[in-house]
Amino acid sequence: YRYENGRDLWGDALSRTNISTSVAALTDIDADPVIDRGRVFAIGQGGRMASYELVSGQRLWEINVAGISTPAVVGDWVFVVTDDSRLLCVARTTGKIRWISQLKRWRDEEDKKGAVRWTGPVAAGGRLILVSTEGDLVYINPADGALAASRDMGHRMTLSPVVADNMLYILADDGRLTAYR
């Protein structure tokens, strides 16, 4: 907003208007917007991810995906987890999807029971790092979306990992904080 008069500079909705489902009606946005080199990247649970010009608010591109986890911008790519447990690599300038990697979606894949939710990604050590509500810690190759490594942490995790001072911090839902170098 303009500090001189309190008026909004610009705004937009991240819910899809061309579909009539209960998901499209959701306006909840849990993911923080990411600002990088004059652009804003945002995703909402209502079914839209978009890129905007920071100052004018002009929508530069949009894709029809829903999510609640903050995207990660690395170089020319935006990485984001969707609400159906897909990790997407999206071109920063065009919104074109480079690759999609399907993460574990169900605790019981055969019966499709026990939905798994993912948070992240964060970028560190040349990898994308994500955690899940099933206690999974995964490392993904950002070039192709391939699983590089995984580990069962044994604890439910709903908060995104944090990277600071060459350390990876993971806070489990039971309060257990784990740090890796």
Which residue stretches match the model-derived regions?
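Short loop/turn segments that connect beta-strands within beta-propeller blades
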Residues: 2-5, 53-56, 92-94, 141-145
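WD40 beta-propeller blade core
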Residues: 7, 50, 88, 138-139, ...
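Extracytoplasmic beta-rich repeat domains
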Residues: 8-35, 58-74, 100-122, 150-163
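Structural signature of WD-repeat beta-propellers
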Residues: 37, 44-45, 82-83, 132-133, ...
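Acidic (E/D-rich), amphipathic helical modules within compact regulatory domains
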Residues: 59-60, 70-91
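Histidine/lysine/aspartate-rich catalytic loop segments that bind and position anionic ligands
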Residues: 88-106
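Blade-level signature of beta-propeller repeat domains, shared across WD40, Kelch, NHL, RCC1
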Residues: 153-181
